[in-house]
């Protein structure tokens, strides 16, 4: 069997707020947007810079709906060049750090819809450092 990863779908309540998080804070880029008036929903496909294939599909239903807590979804993971600089940038933009990069290798942040985003340091872990080393999980 030949499998190829396509994308992860994340259902969102507020498309503008989610795009602000995924694009402005995380740095993903919109590679396609499709509005479906007859179905009353919008799909937005996002990719990390330098990737041509969508990795995240944001699905926004136009009619109000109650979405689950998000933790049962699991998470989406991205590799970053500098875990500390990335977390500092996200924190400055108001993003919640669920698990700080105490080990210099891994952190989790939360999207507006309570989806966990894992950030992994590229290559070897960085030397553990403050303020991350003593920061508790959220």
Language-model features: where?
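Active-site/binding-pocket entry motifs
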Residues: 51-52, 64, 125
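Short, mixed charged/polar active-site loops
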Residues: 53-55, 116
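Generic domain-boundary/flexible-linker signal
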Residues: 19, 67-69, 125-130
């Amino acid at each position: 069997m030949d499998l190829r990863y396509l994308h992860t779908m994340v259902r969102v309540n507020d498309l503008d707020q989610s795009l602000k998080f995924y694009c402005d804070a995380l740095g993903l880029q919109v590679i396609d947007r499709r509005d479906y008036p007859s179905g009353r929903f919008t799909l937005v496909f996002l990719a990390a810079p330098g990737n041509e294939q969508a990795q995240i599909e944001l699905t926004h239903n136009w009619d109000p709906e109650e979405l689950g807590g998000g933790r049962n979804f699991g998470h989406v993971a991205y590799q970053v060049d500098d875990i500390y600089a990335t977390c500092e940038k996200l924190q400055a933009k108001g993003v919640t750090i669920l698990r700080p990069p105490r080990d210099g290798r891994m952190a989790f942040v939360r999207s507006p819809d309570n989806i966990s985003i894992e950030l992994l340091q590229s290559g070897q872990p960085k030397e553990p450092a403050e303020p991350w080393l003593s920061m508790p999980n959220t």
